[in-house]
């Protein structure tokens, strides 16, 4: 189902590098079609050194809103004129809203999307009960840390190959967040209640992070922000160890809802199950 659009169409989009794998256009355009809106949602892949120029070119209303993904989330916050409390706390943005006066507002729906996905796929999980381990220290990790702290996580270890990058993130958030190298994982995992892959490792079917998930408590939840493939190598290892898992597609769907509401001015239509649609396109059903 598709809609013809006019010159008055509301245009949204997603920006990243690479962007070909993104399911966001499928999700948003399905909601647009179901609602019969005069609107579109378009993928963009600006050169890595042209992101700020690209955003400046959209000021003034050509695009109503823009999702931002790897590797631009931290730069998205920096290019904005104003920002939500959550985006400022995270130090990163995954949504830019373009106002008629030419100003740009930054927001971050990654954290709420993460918590929403956990609530759906790991019901009853208590984020306040045990430490969290996050693999990666980029913009996605920043959004996760901000939301988890607000939700009451007692301690968060950010593990990154480059410890200095993890330390820069930890310094933003205070004493509850610590930076660690990958060699610290054997000591961290036995106490972790939640383990999150916030890197791009595993995208396209490659190997995920090398963490030994058999070291985690049997009650631990393992989450991967990567959603292509749906059952990443990281999640398959978690399942083999008997751990509950949360996939990246559910996080994408949960963060897409407030994005759609912001850009198009209404809630997504319940007429279509976009998860089923996305699963079909991923070859999962």
Curated annotation (Swiss-Prot):
Q: Which GO terms describe its molecular function?
A: NADP binding; shikimate 3-dehydrogenase (NADP+) activity
Query: What Enzyme Commission number does this protein have?
Result: 1.1.1.25
Q: What UniProt keywords apply to this chain's record, in alphabetical order?
A: Amino-acid biosynthesis, Aromatic amino acid biosynthesis, NADP, Oxidoreductase
Q: Which domain of life is it from?
A: Bacteria
User: Where is shikimate bound in this sequence?
Assistant: 22-24, 69, 94, 110, 227
The record's PANTHER family line, in alphabetical order, gives: BIFUNCTIONAL 3-DEHYDROQUINATE DEHYDRATASE_SHIKIMATE DEHYDROGENASE, CHLOROPLASTIC, SHIKIMATE DEHYDROGENASE
User: Which family does the record claim for this protein?
Assistant: Belongs to the shikimate dehydrogenase family.
Q: Which NCBIfam families match?
A: aroE
What's the protein here called? Answer: Shikimate dehydrogenase (NADP(+))
Write the lineage as a comma-separated list.
Bacteria, Pseudomonadati, Pseudomonadota, Alphaproteobacteria, Caulobacterales
């Amino acid at each position: 189902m598709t809609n013809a659009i006019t010159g008055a169409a509301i245009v949204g989009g997603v920006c990243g590098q690479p962007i070909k794998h993104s399911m966001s256009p499928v999700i948003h355009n399905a909601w647009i079609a179901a609602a019969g809106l005069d609107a579109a949602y378009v993928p963009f892949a600006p050169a890595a050194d042209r992101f700020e120029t690209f955003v400046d070119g959209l000021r003034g209303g050509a695009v109503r809103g823009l999702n931002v993904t790897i590797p631009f989330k931290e730069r998205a916050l920096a290019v904005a004129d104003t920002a939500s409390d959550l985006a400022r706390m995270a130090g990163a943005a995954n949504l830019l809203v373009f106002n008629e006066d030419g100003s740009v507002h930054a927001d971050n729906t990654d954290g709420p999307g993460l918590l929403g996905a956990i609530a759906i796929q790991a019901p009853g999980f208590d984020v306040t009960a045990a430490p969290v381990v996050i693999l990666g220290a980029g913009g996605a990790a920043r959004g996760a840390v901000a939301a988890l702290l607000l939700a009451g996580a007692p301690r968060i270890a950010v593990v990154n190959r480059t410890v200095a990058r993890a330390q820069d993130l930890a310094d933003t958030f205070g004493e509850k967040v610590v930076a660690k190298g990958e060699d610290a994982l054997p000591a961290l995992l036995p106490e972790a209640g939640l383990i999150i892959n916030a890197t791009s490792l595993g995208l396209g079917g490659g190997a995920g992070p090398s963490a030994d998930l058999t070291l985690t408590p049997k009650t631990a939840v393992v989450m991967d922000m990567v959603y292509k493939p749906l059952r990443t190598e990281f999640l398959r290892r978690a399942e083999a160890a008997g751990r509950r898992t949360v996939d990246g597609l559910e996080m994408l769907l949960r963060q897409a809802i407030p994005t759609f509401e912001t850009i198009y001015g209404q809630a997504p239509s319940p007429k279509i199950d976009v998860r089923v649609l996305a699963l079909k396109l991923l070859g999962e059903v």
